[in-house]
């Protein structure tokens, strides 16, 4: 912010005098929020985020840039979207990207000042236009050392394996085991992870085997960090979509990103149509 600690302290003191309440208190050499401070911070955080975004847009526009705010599921952004963004930046050097994340539930695009979002689920979003991107191919994947440690060479061996679970996707193992004709195995046992990125790290560390979208782990499979210990896969129940507010559909930066990501998704779908093993 360009302010010294003492200057920040003075600003806080002015705000506390204006509000007539203490926002912070010292506890064992630590400065922590009071109950009033916590409530106040919660109430104004959204407004501050909007102010920050608006400020960045104004600063970017001074240099001739247009800001595109993309909101994505965390693992999709880190494992699929971000590695491809260099090509978008090369095509559109005047568009500055702002990437944020959300977890599974739809939200108000306009109220959150989001230009485009990546959605997994049904082809619907409140007050949003929807373009289909791609489906998932779910595959079993684990580290080579884990497969060796339990002698995992066929789907029947999953009965003695630790099944790594993605918290919001219990259908992944249910559907994969059904496709492998192993429905007698309990599909819901095993440690649970909030994000696929966490589950992938656990699989690479040898904690167990995951039912993972293949497009998220192609690099890990290629470099040998993960393997598919036996044949088999299943198409996921849902699909990834690009969503954006109707009021922003004609914005140049939105049109540019839509064209680009649909092209990238077509390439992914082409790879997915190849016979799986």
Predicted regions and their residues:
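Acidic, Gly/Pro-rich loop/turn segments at junctions of secondary structure
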Residues: 100-164, 168-192
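Ligand-binding "clamshell"
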Residues: 125-130, 134, 220-230
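C-terminal effector-binding regulatory domain of bacterial HTH transcription factors
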Residues: 94, 214-223, 231-277
């Amino acid at each position: 912010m360009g302010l010294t600690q003492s200057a920040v302290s003075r600003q806080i003191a002015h705000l506390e005098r204006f509000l007539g309440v203490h926002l912070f208190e010292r506890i064992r050499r630590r400065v922590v929020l009071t109950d009033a401070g916590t409530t106040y911070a919660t109430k104004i955080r959204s407004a501050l985020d909007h102010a920050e975004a608006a400020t960045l847009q104004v600063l970017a526009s001074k240099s001739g840039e247009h800001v595109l705010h993309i909101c994505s599921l965390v693992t999709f952004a880190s494992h699929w979207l971000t590695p491809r963004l260099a090509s978008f930046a090369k095509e559109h050097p005047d568009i500055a990207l702002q990437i944020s994340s959300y977890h599974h539930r739809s939200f108000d695009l306009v109220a959150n000042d989001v230009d485009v979002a990546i959605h997994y689920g049904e082809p619907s979003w409140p007050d949003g236009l929807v373009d289909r991107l791609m489906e998932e191919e779910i595959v079993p994947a684990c580290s080579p050392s884990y497969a060796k440690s339990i002698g995992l060479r066929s789907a029947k061996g999953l009965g003695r394996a630790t099944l790594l679970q993605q918290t919001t996707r219990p259908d992944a193992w249910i559907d994969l085991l059904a496709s492998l004709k192993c429905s007698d195995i309990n599909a819901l046992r095993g440690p649970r992870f909030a994000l696929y990125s966490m589950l992938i790290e656990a699989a690479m560390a040898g904690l167990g085997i995951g039912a993972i979208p293949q497009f998220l782990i192609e690099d890990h499979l290629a470099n040998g960090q993960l393997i598919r210990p036996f044949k088999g896969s299943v198409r996921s129940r849902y699909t990834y979509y690009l969503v954006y507010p109707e009021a922003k559909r004609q914005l140049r930066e939105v049109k540019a990103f839509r064209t680009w990501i649909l092209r990238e998704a077509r390439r992914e779908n082409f790879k997915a149509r190849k016979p799986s093993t």
